Amino acid sequence: MTSSVSFASFRFPWLLKTFVLMVGLATVAFMVRKVSLTTDFSTFKPKFPEPARVDPVLKLLPEEHLRKLFTYSDIWLFPKNQCDCNSGKLRMKYKFQDAYNQKDLPAVNARRQAEFEHFQRREGLPRPPPLLAPPNLPFGYPVHGVEVMPLHTILIPGLQYEGPDAPVYEVILKASLGTLNTLADVPDDEVQGRGQRQLTISTRHRKVLNFILQHVTYTSTEYYLHKVDTVSMEYESSVAKFPVTIKQQTVPKLYDPGPERKIRNLVTIATKTFLRPHKLKILLQSIRKYYPDITVIVADDSKEPLEINDDYVEYYTMPFGKGWFAGRNLAISQVTTKYVLWVDDDFLFSDKTKIEVLVDVLEKTELDVVGGSVQGNTYQFRLLYEQTKNGSCLHQRWGSFQALDGFPGCTLTSGVVNFFLAHTEQLRRVGFDPILQRVAHGEFFIDGLGRLLVGSCPGVIINHQVRTPPKDPKLAALEKTYDKYRANTNSVIQFKVALQYFKNHLYCST
C-alpha cells in the first residue's frame, strides 16, 4: 500500500511537467504560426487583370486653332494647297484671270504655264527638299555654308569620324556635280578614287582617318551660275548628307564718290515729265535753291521739247506719249552716280527735303530703297505673298512691318511714295515695265518683291505744287490733255489685272 502511494506520488509531478512542456510548445508553435500568417497577409497584394493596351490617338490641332496661331494681318500665312483671297476676314480685290475673255483663257493659261516653268528652271525652282540628318551619326560634317565657284576647288570643312573604335575604318564619300580628293599624302590602298565622284578611305588607324577627312577637297567640274550638289558620307549603315553650293560670284560695280564725297557725286535726281512744262520749271527752280549743282535727268515724251538753260540738267526727249514707265527707264539708264533720287515733275523742294538724310540711311543699312513723304503722305504699304501651283495670292496692307534699327521714325515696308532714294544698280535690275504707259506705281514694287529691301523715313519731306489750273490758256489746254492720258479707266485697270495674271503668275489679291 505504501509502495503504491509512493509510485503515484512520483509519477504525478512528471506528468505535470510533461503537460506544461507540451502546452508551452503548442503556445510557441501557435505564436510562430500567427506571426507567419500576419506577415503573409500583410505582404499579400491581390493581382487584378491588366487592362488591354490602347494605342494613343495622334491628332493635329483643328484648322480653326491653326488659323489663330499663324495669322498675320487677317491673312493665314500657313502652307496650303491653294491660297484663298475670299476666306475668313479677307475680301477679294481682284481675281486676275477674270480680266480675260473666257474663250481665250485656255490658250492664255497654256502659254502662262509654259513661261512659268521656264522661269522656274532659270531660278532653280522648286528648291531641293531639306537634308535630314539621321540620329546618332558617327560623323562631324558641315550642315550649311560650303560654297565653291564653278571649276574651283575648296577644302570641305568639319569632316571627322567620332564613332566607336574598329579594326578597320572604311568611309565612302560621294558627289554628283564635282569630284573629291584629299591633300593627305597616304598610300593608294588607304585612299581610292582620287579625282573621282566617289572617294573611298580605308585604314586601321583612327588618327589617319581623321587626318584624311580633315583634308578632303571638292572640285567643281562643270560651269554653273548657281547649283547645289549633295555630298554623302557613309560608314557601315550610317549615311550623312550635306550641301555644297556651286555659285559664280559677281564682279563688284562701284561708284567713286570723289575725295570730298559731295552730294552731287553721290546722287542724281531723275524725273519724267509729260505735257506739264510749267510744273517741271517750278520743280527745277526749287531744286536749285537747295542743290545748285546736283545733276537732274529729265525724260520727256511731250509733243514739243523744252528749252532748259541749266548746265546741270540732262534733258532727253521721247516719242510722244511713249509712257510713264518707259520714261523712268530712260532717266535711270543715264544715271552715273551710286544713288538716284526719284521725284515727280510737280513736286517742290523745301528746307525739309534733306537728301543727305536719305543717303545716310542707305549708307548705313542694307536697304535698296528708302522713301520720304510728300507733305506727310508716305504711301507705305506691305506686300504679303502666298505661292501655290495655279497662281499666287498677293495681299496689300497699309503701313510697315517694323522699325528700322538705328533710325528713329524710319520703318521697313514693301512700297513707298513716288519720292525715294535708291541704289542705282538695284533699280535697274528690277526695272520699270514699259508696257505700263499711263498709270502705274505699285506695280514696280510688286516686280521688286524679294529683290528690293524697302524702307521709309517720313521725316524727309517734299512738297506738292498747288493744283490750281493755270491761267495761261495754252498751259490749261495741256493739263486738260494730260488728265485724259492719266485717267485710270476701267479698261486700264483690266489691262493691268490681265498683265499681272500672266506676268506675275498671280491668282488673286486682297
Curated annotation (Swiss-Prot):
Pathway, per record: Protein modification; protein glycosylation; Glycolipid biosynthesis
GO CC terms of this entry: Golgi membrane
GO molecular function terms noted in the UniProt entry: acetylgalactosaminyltransferase activity
Annotated Pfam families: Glycos_transf_2
Membrane-crossing residue ranges in chain numbering: 16-32
Catalyzed chemical reaction(s): an N-acetyl-alpha-neuraminyl-(2->3)-beta-D-galactosyl derivative + UDP-N-acetyl-alpha-D-galactosamine = an N-acetyl-beta-D-galactosaminyl-(1->4)-[N-acetyl-alpha-neuraminyl-(2->3)]-beta-D-galactosyl derivative + UDP + H(+); a 3-O-{alpha-Neu5Ac-(2->3)-beta-D-Gal-(1->3)-[alpha-Neu5Ac-(2->6)]-alpha-D-GalNAc}-L-seryl-[protein] + UDP-N-acetyl-alpha-D-galactosamine = a 3-O-{[alpha-Neu5Ac-(2->3)]-beta-D-GalNAc-(1->4)-beta-D-Gal-(1->3)-[alpha-Neu5Ac-(2->6)]-alpha-D-GalNAc}-L-seryl-[protein] + UDP + H(+); a 3-O-{alpha-Neu5Ac-(2->3)-beta-D-Gal-(1->3)-[alpha-Neu5Ac-(2->6)]-alpha-D-GalNAc}-L-threonyl-[protein] + UDP-N-acetyl-alpha-D-galactosamine = a 3-O-{[alpha-Neu5Ac-(2->3)]-beta-D-GalNAc-(1->4)-beta-D-Gal-(1->3)-[alpha-Neu5Ac-(2->6)]-alpha-D-GalNAc}-L-threonyl-[protein] + UDP + H(+); a neolactoside IV(3)-alpha-NeuAc-nLc4Cer + UDP-N-acetyl-alpha-D-galactosamine = a neolactoside IV(4)-GalNAc,IV(3)-alpha-NeuAc-nLc4Cer + UDP + H(+)
Source organism of this protein record: Mus musculus
CDD domains: Glyco_tranf_GTA_type (cd00761)
SUPFAM superfamilies documented for this protein: Nucleotide-diphospho-sugar transferases
Cytoplasmic-facing ranges: 1-15
Domain of life: Eukaryota
Membrane topology: Single-pass type II membrane protein
Protein name: Beta-1,4 N-acetylgalactosaminyltransferase 2
Top-tier EC class: transferase
Function: Beta-1,4 N-acetylgalactosaminyltransferase involved in the biosynthesis of T-lymphocyte CT glycan antigen carried by CD45 family of protein phosphatases. Catalyzes the transfer of N-acetylgalactosamine (GalNAc) group in a beta-1,4-linkage from UDP-GalNAc to the galactose residue of NeuAcalpha2->3Gal-R to form GalNAcbeta1->4(NeuAcalpha2->3)Gal-R glycan epitope.
Residue intervals on the Lumenal side: 33-510
GO terms, biological process: lipid glycosylation; negative regulation of cell-cell adhesion; protein glycosylation; protein import; skeletal muscle fiber differentiation; skeletal muscle tissue regeneration; UDP-N-acetylgalactosamine metabolic process; UDP-N-acetylglucosamine metabolic process
UniProt-listed PANTHER family: BETA-1,4 N-ACETYLGALACTOSAMINYLTRANSFERASE 2 (PTHR15046:SF2), GLYCO_TRANS_2-LIKE DOMAIN-CONTAINING PROTEIN (PTHR15046)
Subcellular location: Golgi apparatus, trans-Golgi network membrane
